[in-house]
Each structure stands twice: as C-alpha cells, then as structure tokens.
Amino acid sequence: MQKLTILGATGSIGASTLKVIEQNPDKFSVVALAADSNVEKMQQLCQRWQPEYAVMANKEAALRLKMALAVLAPNTQVLGGQEALCYVATLEQVDSVMAAIVGAAGLVPTMAAVKAGKRILLANKEALVMSGQLFIDEVEKSGAQLLPVDSEHNAIFQCLPQTVQGNLGRCDLASQGVSHILLTGSGGPFRYTDVAELEAVTPEQAIAHPNWSMGPKISVDSATMMNKGLEYIEAKWLFNASRDQLKVIIHPQSVIHSMVQYLDGSVLAQMGEPDMATPIALTLSYPERVKAGVKPLDFTQVGELTFLQPDFERYPCLALAIEACYLGQHATTTLNAANEVAVAAFLARQIKFTDIARVNDSVLNQVCKQSLASGLDSLESLLELDRMARTLADEVVRERAQ
C-alpha cells in the first residue's frame, strides 16, 4: 500500500489523483491533503477521505476548516501555513508526494519533499522553472525519485528508454540514440484567431480550452502558450536536453501528447484521451500500470491528426520562455513570477490579453539588465528574485492599467 500526501488537493490535478486512487483502493491510501484556501472543497474531501492531516496554506482558512471538521472528520488534524505544507510533505509514513500546488507557492514544500528523499510526482512545473539546477542537484543528493505528471513530460518519459527514466536530470539523450524531443501543444483556443483580434480577448474566452479541463491560470497560460514555454523549460531540466534536441510542435487535436525522435528515424509517440488521470496513474504506479478510469482511445473516431509550426507573432510568450531558458536561471525565475502577476491582472480585467506578453517582456528586460545571473545558489536567493520580479510586474501592470 503506497501512502500519499497530495499538495494541491482541491485543484484539478488533486481531483484526478483522487479519481485514480478511488479506482485502486487496495494500492493507495491518502495520509495528508493540502490546499491553499478553498475550505468548502477541502471539507468535502476530508469527509470523503478522512486523512490523518488536512493543511491549508492560508492560516485563516485553516481555522475555518478546523471548526468545520470538528464533527465531520474529528480524527483529521488540521494545520495551517507553509511550514505545515512542508511538514506533511516530509512525513515519515508518506512514500509519495503529489506536488500539484500551482505557481511559486508550490516550490518550498516540493523542495522539502525532495530533501526528504520522497517519490515526487511532479505536477508543479514552477519547481523546475524557478529552481532548475538546484532542484535537480537536490534530487540527486537526497536519492528522491522524480516522476513527471504533466501530460507532455509524462508522454516523453514513456517514450524514452528505462535508463533515461531512472536518471532524470542527468541523462545523456544522444548516448541513448535520441535525436529530438517533440513537445506538442494544442495551440489553445486562439490558434486560428486573427492576431489583430487578440487584444479584445476576454478572460471567459481565454479559459475555455478546447481539449483539456484545467484551472483558470493554466488555461490562460495555454491560450498564450506560456504553458508550453514553461513546459519547454521543464523539459530542458528533466531530460537534460540541449536547444537542438528540444522542439515545440502545435498539434490541435491533443491526441498525441508528445513524441521522441531517434537517430535511426523512428518516432515514438504516446497517445490517449486528453485526461490527466492517465499520466497520474502511471506516476502513482510506476513501473507498473493500474486502472485510471479513462476510456481507451477509439482510433475510428480520431479523424485526422494535424501538426503546425508555432507562430511566434501569435504566441510571443512562448518565444520569451524559450529565450529565457538559455539566458539562465535568473531569467526563467523572473519570467515565471512576472507571468503569474500578469495573468492574475488579466483575469481581474486590469490589463488586456496581449498585455500579458508585454508585462513579461518588460520585467524580463529590467531584470536581465541588472546582471543578476550569479549568486542564485539557494532557495532563499531564488525566492528573493521571485519577490523582486513580482514587484516590478505589479508596477508594469499599474502603468498598463491606466
């Protein structure tokens, strides 16, 4: 029986994880559930799963949850704050940690789980975007096992040899006969929209993803293709890939979740319904496979599969992310912070959809001019840079909102 802590239990990844566990009650059990501030949802989950621990990052939310669970789940211990997140991520009885807290907030508890040598089911892409080398070094030092949950990285993982699967972050792709990793993305809801019309896009339009069911932030990132940009950075670290080895391809149907091209001309592709339960099930059970509650792909209903080159005029955020990836850690940490602020401002109707890329570009330029590439050798220094970039982004948002 594998024992789990789920960081980000009230989000879409948390829901899919619990769906897989429900399919396999003899294989997995939930020790701790953690979330940010959604008390109502957490209350329902604690009633259903009766975990040993329930943690809210927001301490006020934790107090409200504690009162609600006094009768509904009296055996569940309720804790609050970031220290509590780290505590349940490192519990001795926990084997695996689902790291699914969105954004920079997930970095510290995920890193705590890594240092504790846990099996890390990595859904929080910001952990690698913000702290790439530091994160990979800690994984190696602690002996933690790293398994990618993101559908694209999970697809790539499945298409790679076992020697690479067991050596993420340190592998040599060329020595394994790999020529290219082909990272696919749907292109979001605006792949055929006239570029001139993107300025008028509303939050409601941006979060209506054609294929996947996701939270609002990641849906906007998918519309700008910043999501693919962050995944590009993540893939660089996970698979130790060079710029020449990593390519982005738009695949509107989201049937192929990514591919690996080999030196002999072979291409291995992982295909399936666009349902996060599939990659989650694999990371939970690896190297075995278990039921995920996902219907099998019906090839007679798939129709045509199409592939396009990304248009960087339509997707400036993708271009920025690829550029930042090779500028260094200071650039990717900055871009991630600026983007979180910009997307939140867009969702709050403070800036236009096309301003997201402008905010990101402005903050990235400001930070890169300050020569901050050196000295980012600790989690604290990265978090300080993250704070600085957010402050700069807030200023740019205020300017654009006037």
UniProtKB/Swiss-Prot annotation:
One record GO biological process: isopentenyl diphosphate biosynthetic process, methylerythritol 4-phosphate pathway involved in terpenoid biosynthetic process
What residues bind Mn(2+), as annotated? D150, E152, E231
State the source organism's domain of life.
Bacteria
Record GO terms (molecular function): 1-deoxy-D-xylulose-5-phosphate reductoisomerase activity; manganese ion binding; NADPH binding
Give the UniProt keywords, A-Z.
Isoprene biosynthesis, Manganese, Metal-binding, NADP, Oxidoreductase
**What EC numbers are recorded for this enzyme?**
1.1.1.267
Record flagged with keyword Transport: no
Query: Which residues are involved in binding 1-deoxy-D-xylulose 5-phosphate?
Result: K125, S151, E152, S186, H209, S222, N227, K228, E231
Q: Which reaction does it catalyse?
A: 2-C-methyl-D-erythritol 4-phosphate + NADP(+) = 1-deoxy-D-xylulose 5-phosphate + NADPH + H(+)
**According to its UniProt record, which cofactors does this protein need?**
Mg(2+); Mn(2+)
**List of residues binding NADPH:** T10, G11, S12, I13, N38, N124, E126, G215
Q: Does the keyword NADP apply?
A: yes
Q: What class of enzyme is it?
A: oxidoreductase
Pathway it works in: Isoprenoid biosynthesis; isopentenyl diphosphate biosynthesis via DXP pathway; isopentenyl diphosphate from 1-deoxy-D-xylulose 5-phosphate: step 1/6
* InterPro entries according to UniProt: DXP_reductoisomerase, DXP_reductoisomerase_C, DXP_reductoisomerase_N, DXPR_C, DXPR_C_sf, NAD(P)-bd_dom_sf
User: Record's Pfam families?
Assistant: DXP_redisom_C, DXP_reductoisom, DXPR_C
Spell out the family assignment given in the record's similarity comment: Belongs to the DXR family.
Per the entry, what this protein does is: Catalyzes the NADPH-dependent rearrangement and reduction of 1-deoxy-D-xylulose-5-phosphate (DXP) to 2-C-methyl-D-erythritol 4-phosphate (MEP).
Name by which UniProt lists this protein = 1-deoxy-D-xylulose 5-phosphate reductoisomerase
Q: Which organism is it from?
A: Vibrio vulnificus (strain CMCP6)
What lineage, starting at the top, does this entry show? Bacteria, Pseudomonadati, Pseudomonadota, Gammaproteobacteria, Vibrionales
